[in-house]
A protein has these predicted regions:
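Acidic/polar-rich alpha-helix caps and helix-coil junctions
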Residues: 1-41, 69-296
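Glycine- and acidic/polar-rich repeat regions and solenoidal domains
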Residues: 37-49, 53, 63
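Aromatic (Trp/Tyr) and acidic
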Residues: 49, 55, 59, 65, ...
C-alpha cells in the first residue's frame, strides 16, 4: 500500500508533526523503520543548526525538489510540499524527526536521535522501475513511473515513454555553473545504452524522480557512485548565483569511499584510503562523503 499522500500533505508543516507521521509504524507503506544516533533531524530540518552547509535555493530549484520535469515544477505538481523560511538557507521535505535523549537534564546533555523510513512502497517502485530500465524492459519501467505519478501528483497525469524521452533529451547536461537535472553517467557499474538513447533518458527520469522523493534520506550518494556522477562543491552569493566552484568529487576520488566504523578501525582493521583536503577558506574537510553548497 502506498502512503496516503492527501492526508500527509494536509498536516501542519511546523514542529514534529510531519516527521513523526512520516516514520509512523501505523503507515502500511513503511516496511522498515530504523532509529539511530544522529543530528540529521536538526541539521537537515527546521533548525538553524547546519544552516551554512545547507540544501539551499540553487540546488532545490535547479536539481531536485523544486526542479522541472515532464510533470512540471516539482514543488507545485507534487503533494509533498517544500518547507522554507526566509530566516534559514534551507529548503527541504519534512521527514526526519529530531528527538533528544537527556542523560543529565540539569546539565542539558545527552544524545540526539533520528528515525528513518528505510524501506517504503515508493522506494520499492522506484527501484523496480530502475531495474526494469536497466534490463531493457522500458515499458514496465514506465508503468512503475506512472504508478508513482498517479499517487504523488496533485492532479494525476501519466506519461508515455516518448514523452519522457523527449523531455530529458531536451535538457542540457549538468555543468557546475549551469546546473540541470541531467547528469553524465561517466563510469556506471552497469552497461547502459549511449547518451540520448531511450534507456538513458528513462534512467535520467527515474533518478530525477528518486532524487525528489528521497531527498534528505541519504540515498543519493548510492546513485552518484553507481552511475559515476561527478559532484562539485560550489559557493553561492546572496543572490543565489554560483560565485565559485572550489572542489569536485570525480569518479575515482578516494573520498567517495564510505569509511569503516571507528570501532573496527580501532580494533585493527585498515581503514579505507581516504584523504583530507583544504577548501579555499583554509578549513580541513576530513572524510567528506557529501559536498554541499556554501552560502556566504
Amino acid at each position: 500500500k502506498a502512503r496516503d499522500w492527501d492526508a500527509y500533505s494536509a498536516l501542519n508543516m511546523n514542529d514534529q508533526i510531519r516527521p513523526e507521521a512520516w516514520v509512523s509504524a501505523d503507515e502500511k507503506c513503511n516496511f522498515l523503520l530504523q532509529t539511530v544516533y544522529s543530528e540529521w533531524g536538526a541539521i537537515g530540518e527546521a533548525y538553524r543548526y547546519g544552516d551554512k552547509y545547507a540544501h539551499s535555493y540553487r540546488i532545490t530549484y535547479d536539481e531536485d525538489i523544486a526542479s522541472k520535469g515532464p510533470f512540471g515544477a516539482a514543488n507545485t505538481t507534487f503533494k509533498q510540499r517544500v518547507w522554507s523560511n526566509n530566516k534559514l538557507a534551507k529548503l527541504f521535505h519534512r521527514k526526519v524527526p529530531y528527538e533528544f535523549e537527556y542523560t543529565d537534564l540539569q546539565a542539558g546533555i545527552g544524545f540526539a536521535h533520528a528515525e528513518y523510513a528505510v524501506f517504503t512502497t515508493e522506494q520499492l517502485l522506484l527501484e523496480r522501475a530502475e531495474a526494469y530500465a536497466l534490463s531493457g524492459e522500458l515499458q514496465k519501467a514506465v508503468d512503475d513511473y506512472n504508478t508513482i505519478m498517479k499517487i504523488y501528483q496533485n492532479y494525476p497525469k501519466t506519461f508515455t515513454l516518448k514523452q519522457i524521452v523527449d523531455f530529458y533529451n531536451g535538457v542540457d547536461y549538468y555543468t557546475p555553473k549551469k546546473a540541470t537535472v541531467k547528469k553524465h553517467f561517466v563510469k556506471p557499474v552497469y552497461t547502459i545504452d549511449a547518451e540520448g538513447s531511450d534507456q538513458e533518458a528513462l534512467l535520467q527520469a527515474i533518478l530525477h524522480l528518486r532524487r525528489i522523493m528521497e531527498v534528505g534520506e541519504g540515498y543519493r550518494m548510492q546513485d552518484v557512485k553507481r552511475y559515476g556522477i561527478v559532484i562539485y562543491r560550489r559557493q553561492t552569493n546572496t543572490s543565489f548565483t554560483i560565485s565559485a566552484v572550489t572542489d569536485s568529487l570525480t569518479v575515482d576520488d578516494p573520498r567517495r569511499a564510505i569509511q569503516l566504523p571507528q570501532d573496527v578501525i580501532t580494533s585493527g582493521l585498515e581503514p579505507n584510503d581516504r584523504i583530507a583536503v583544504k577548501d579555499q577558506g583554509g578549513n580541513i574537510m576530513q572524510d567528506s562523503g557529501f559536498i554541499y553548497e556554501i552560502k556566504k
